[in-house]
Structures are given as C-alpha cells and as structure tokens.
C-alpha cells in the first residue's frame, strides 16, 4: 500500500536519502526545509520530489510525518503545529528502525569511514542482487522487490539505538561529537550497546583497541592488516590508479582484489565489505568484479580539474579523517605540493581537538584555514577562534575568506584539498571562479 510521506527537514543527508528511497518504492513523498541550497537537494529535484518552505499548512492529517532530529517545537513551526494538533511523527532513526525489519539488513557504523564503506557495500550488492540502500551522502535507492537493505548507522545522540540489523560493520571508535558524548568511554558504551543488537555477525577493525573490547551476542569477526585478525588484507600494492591487495580468512585465500580508491583506510573499508559478504554467502568473484567499478560517494575525496589544477573536496572534519584524506592525496599525487584548505566544524569539536587538528593538518605542505563553522546546536561563546588553530600550525599558509581565495595561487604544481563539514564548498567554488577568470584574462 502506498503512503504519502512529509519530511520535516528533507535536505538533511539522511532524510534526503530516505525520501529518495521511499519515492523509488512507489510512495508519494514531499518535504520542507530552509531555502539555502544544500548539495542533497539536486537528487530530490531530479526525482521530482517537492521541496516546500516550512509552513504549518504542510501538516495535514493524511500524511505520515518524518521529522529531522534537529527540529523541535521551539525552532520549527511544523513540529509545533503537529504537537498542537496531536499529530504523531517519527524521527528519522525511529522510522528506520521499523523499516529495516522487512529486510535482511546490513549496517555500517563507526566514527569515521562509514559513508564510504556504506557506499562501497551498497554498490557491490546492488550489482549482484536487488538491494535498497541509504547512504549518508544523501543518496538512497529503493526497490519494492529488494530482499536486502544496506544503511549507514549513526552514533550521534545514540541514533542507532533502534537498529537491529542482521549484519553490521564497525570501522572504528573515536572521540567525536563532544557536544553530546562526554568521553571516549561514553562513545564506546554507545557502540557496545549497538553491537549487542546485531543478529547474525559483526565485523570490526581489529587494530582499533576500543573495538577489541566490543562484546556482542552474534559472532565477532576482526579484519585488518595484522595476522591476529580473522580476515587479513596483505600484499598491498598502492598506485596512482588505486589499490590492489589480497585477503585471507584463516588458512583460506579469498583472492586478489582491486579498488579505484586511495589510502590504507579504503583498503580496510573494502576488506570489511569482503568479510561481510563472504560470511553472508555471496560469490567473492562477483564481489571482486564490482569492487573495481566503485565510483565513490559524494563529498568523499571528490575530484575535479579546473584549468589543469586538481581540486579535491572532502567531508573530513575530524583529525583522523584529515590524516586519511591527506594520505590518499599523497598516494594519488606523490609529486605535487599538497595544499590543505580546512574549515573547522563546531566550536565544541575545535576546542576539544585543537592540538590533534594541528598535528593532522601539519601533514600537508601548506595549510589555509577558514572561519569556524558553528552548528545550529551551539552558540559561539568566544572560547576558541580559528586563529588559535592557526598558531599551532607550522606550515606555510594562513587564513582565507570566501571573498578572497587568491593566497591559494601562491603554489605551483599543487593539488588543493578542501576539507570540512560546513560550507567549505563555497570557498572551493570561489577558488574555481578565480582560476577560471585567470585563464579567461590570459586568453
């Protein structure tokens, strides 16, 4: 039976993906959000999904309401109206917990790498069998006939609490979201609770000391580079076109695999996918075939060339992610100067990880910083400024603004890596316009 769904905050990455998936399954879908452009809305518009401004007139008794987690009666007219009228609504994660019960579900959790790993798992599975999926880059695909459902499992505010998947990968555990989690132990406890809800098998990165502490009711399989793991990636051959490696499970050689992505972290993500699909009974020859054709996910090492200048856009907003992105860029462009342009995301994270951010960014050849992007969940109380981070960085560079990205032109034979979870893309677009104008003036 088809339903009509109204999404309150439809441009959110998870919300837009869910909207697309339900639309493709034959349901009527609409949603509301702020007017500001967000990268997820292109897919919604291409699908013909209506995006409305927030208005209580959108809330009627005949629609099923799905509300973004950031919206409350005190900051959203639609939530306030729904509460006043006695209309019920489900939060994104509550809806998802119910929805996945109709499938064999495969989750991907972890502090870092979950979007890329979810995208890789979904890509391989959809090319082998009918699969619905939700990826944290705003991509979703729904099929009424799908037996399998692949989804990204988010730890923030323990949103993964309603999820009970058949299988799950956990890529790592790290201290992040200091506006919610109080300590690394608090983060661990959240993941450990989630792990206990996995039904058939759990796949965790064995070189993460926190993940070695995980307990679960289902069997736990460790993957990694070291021999004490259940699934071991070895004979790694990185190149400027990707990575080649072999995997063994105990004494069994599972084969040689290739991925068109860069950095050791992506080899680990692929090993997790191989381990999960091997235990789930998939043909590894087919898995190997489709690993080769993975095109990546949005805002994860997304490359473009503007007038012979290489520009990379990445969502990295935690020190661990910055290190991985710089590592990947070095693998693909070993002879180029690596210029990092970073926008810190949230004041709480910047304060909590100031030294770690500096250490990570010092891995680049030059570092430019944008002003801190504050979250809607917090206020700037003046405790930290981007200049505090700049003072800890020992590479050439400085501060840039959207209006003036010309300092970035001081580099020859460079690859430019724009990183952040805020509006860092506006800085990237400004630099691209600058490059285009320079070329036009020369001609």
From Swiss-Prot:
Localization per Swiss-Prot or TrEMBL: Cytoplasm
Catalysis performed (reactions): UDP-N-acetyl-alpha-D-muramate + L-alanine + ATP = UDP-N-acetyl-alpha-D-muramoyl-L-alanine + ADP + phosphate + H(+)
Stated family: Belongs to the MurCDEF family.
The protein's annotated pathway: Cell wall biogenesis; peptidoglycan biosynthesis
Protein known as: UDP-N-acetylmuramate--L-alanine ligase
Keywords, ordered alphabetically: ATP-binding, Cell cycle, Cell division, Cell shape, Cell wall biogenesis/degradation, Cytoplasm, Ligase, Nucleotide-binding, Peptidoglycan synthesis
Binding site for ATP: 110-116
A GO CC term attached to the entry: cytoplasm
One GO BP annotation of this record: regulation of cell shape
General function of this protein: Cell wall formation.
NCBIfam families: murC
InterPro entries, per the entry: Mur-like_cat_sf (IPR036565), Mur_ligase_C (IPR004101), Mur_ligase_C_dom_sf (IPR036615), Mur_ligase_cen (IPR013221), Mur_ligase_N (IPR000713), MurCDEF_pg_biosynth (IPR050061), UDP-N-AcMur_Ala_ligase_MurC (IPR005758)
PANTHER family linked: UDP-N-ACETYLMURAMATE--L-ALANINE LIGASE (PTHR43445:SF3), UDP-N-ACETYLMURAMATE--L-ALANINE LIGASE-RELATED (PTHR43445)
Keyword hit for Cell division: yes
Pfam families assigned to the protein according to its UniProt record, in alphabetical order: Mur_ligase, Mur_ligase_C, Mur_ligase_M
Annotated EC: 6.3.2.8
Residue pairs linked by disulfide bridges in the UniProt entry: none
GO MF: ATP binding; UDP-N-acetylmuramate-L-alanine ligase activity
Source organism (scientific name): Streptococcus suis (strain 05ZYH33)
């Amino acid at each position: 039976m088809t339903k009509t769904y109204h999404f309150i905050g439809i441009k959110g990455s998870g919300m837009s993906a869910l909207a697309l998936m339900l639309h493709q399954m034959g349901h009527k879908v609409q949603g509301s959000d702020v007017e500001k452009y967000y990268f997820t809305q292109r897919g919604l518009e291409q699908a013909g999904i209506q995006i409305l401004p927030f208005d209580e007139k959108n809330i009627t008794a005949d629609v099923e309401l799905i509300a973004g987690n950031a919206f409350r009666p005190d900051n959203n007219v639609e939530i306030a109206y729904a509460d006043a009228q006695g209309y019920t609504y489900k939060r994104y994660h509550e809806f998802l917990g119910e929805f996945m019960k109709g499938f064999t579900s495969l989750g991907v959790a972890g502090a870092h790498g979950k979007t890329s790993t979810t995208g890789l798992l979904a890509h391989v599975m959809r090319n082998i069998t009918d699969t619905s999926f939700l990826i944290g880059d705003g991509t979703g695909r729904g099929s009424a006939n799908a037996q399998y459902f692949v989804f990204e499992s988010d730890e923030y505010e323990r949103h993964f609490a309603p999820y009970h998947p058949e299988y799950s990968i956990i890529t790592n555990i790290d201290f992040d979201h200091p506006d919610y989690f109080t300590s690394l132990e608090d983060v661990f406890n959240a993941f450990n609770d989630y792990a206990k809800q996995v039904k058939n098998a759990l796949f965790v990165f064995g070189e993460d000391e926190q993940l070695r502490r995980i307990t679960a009711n289902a069997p736990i399989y460790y993957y990694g580079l070291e021999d004490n793991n259940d699934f071991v990636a070895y004979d790694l051959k990185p190149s400027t076109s990707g990575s080649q490696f072999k995997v063994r499970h105990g004494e069994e050689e599972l084969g040689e695999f290739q991925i068109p992505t860069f950095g050791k972290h992506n080899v680990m993500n692929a090993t997790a996918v191989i381990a999960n699909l091997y235990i789930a009974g998939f043909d590894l020859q087919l898995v190997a075939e489709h690993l080769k054709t993975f095109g990546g996910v949005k805002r994860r090492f997304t490359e473009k060339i503007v007038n012979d200048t290489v520009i990379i856009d990445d969502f990295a907003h935690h020190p661990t992610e910055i290190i991985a992105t710089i590592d990947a860029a070095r693998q693909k462009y070993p002879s180029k100067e690596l210029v990092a342009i970073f926008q810190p995301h949230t004041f709480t994270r910047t304060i909590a990880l100031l030294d770690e951010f500096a250490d990570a960014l010092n891995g680049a050849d030059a570092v430019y910083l944008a002003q801190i992007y504050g979250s809607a969940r917090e206020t700037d109380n003046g405790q930290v400024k981007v200049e505090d981070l700049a003072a800890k960085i020992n590479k050439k560079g400085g501060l840039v603004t959207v209006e003036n990205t010309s300092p970035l032109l001081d580099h020859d034979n460079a690859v430019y890596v724009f990183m952040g979870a805020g509006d860092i893309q506006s800085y990237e677009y400004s630099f691209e316009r600058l490059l285009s104008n320079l070329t036009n003036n020369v001609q």
